[in-house]
Amino acid sequence: VALISNQFLPYPYYAKPGAVRSPAQILQWQALPNTVPATSCQAQPATVARHPHPRLSFMAIPPKKSQDKTDHPTINTSATVESTATPTTEAVVDTAATQEASPEVIASAPEASTDQVTSTVV
């Protein structure tokens, strides 16, 4: 029968030794070190070794290694660009020669006329 002390008291655990020892040693009680850190204001005896256990939240558990290579789905992080109709204004230059109704031959350069054209580019 093992006498287990309260977790808040800084006393060591007491347990009987295992059956692998001689019968003379089985009747003796063996003091085990306190593995639970004391949270009370009492000072621990100098003979007890204090080995605090880290809380479970601080323990890192490594992932299981598997022989099979698992394919991780790739996530497309680039956004799809939807084209929208953007009205643009382009200057269209008409370089065609404007001929007047005259029997004379025009030796000058053809006149250029500029018209504003609005189109939608998709």
From Swiss-Prot:
Modified residues (Phosphoserine): 102, 119
Residue positions, PTM Phosphothreonine: 98
Site (Cleavage) location in chain: 58-59
The entry's keywords: Glycoprotein, Milk protein, Phosphoprotein, Secreted
Annotated stretches, region: Disordered: 43-122
Residues with glycosylation annotation: 74, 76, 84, 86, 89, 95, 102, 118
Comp. bias intervals (Polar residues): 73-89, 111-122
Tissue: Mammary gland specific. Secreted in milk.
Cross-referenced Pfam families: Casein_kappa (PF00997)
Record InterPro entries: Casein_kappa (IPR000117)
GO biological processes: lactation; protein stabilization
GO cellular component, one term: extracellular space
Compartments in which it is found: Secreted
Function: Kappa-casein stabilizes micelle formation, preventing casein precipitation in milk.
UniProt record similarity statement: Belongs to the kappa-casein family.
Protein name: Kappa-casein
Organism of this sequence: Muntiacus reevesi
Gene: CSN3
